[in-house]
Amino acid sequence: MSAPQQVENNRLAAVINDENRETEALFQQFESGVSDPEEGRRLVGEIIYVLVRRVVLRERLVYPAIQRSLDDGDDVVDLEVLADDEVGRLLKLIADTPTTSGTFEPLVARLIEQVRERMGDEQADLLPRLGEALGAEVADELGNELARARDAAPSPESADVGPDVVERFREQVSTSTS
């Protein structure tokens, strides 16, 4: 998939685009092939952590701004939450699947496809609409707040991607950014 054109006319868009680039780099690293199952598991742990952090910070900071600023904000957030739930289900399936299983790579590929589609939609529609609705000053403030929260979030404590990894990472990010 070719990368969507990135809109960076405010700090919020710039911070979200940074997150998207970080996520895409991890996806490309996975897609380039990982020969060692332990390295694959570590990389998937990073992907899970980045996506969980993304969801937690969106729920806390971005979704309320969408609801306040866009006429259809509640509907937009409802759709975002449904998509987040689907990503969460996939993350849990991936965390519970051995890297040597024949279903592991197809699950990760499905996750990557869904997240890329959402990042593209975000670039094409949501970020321009939200930036316009918020205005430059508020979008810049929200972007700065999002960046501070992202920077305050811890790194994963270990590469152990076990059955409760999504909940564990969610708790780590939530606690550190409260």
Predicted stretch roles:
Residues 1-178:
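Small-residue-biased structural context
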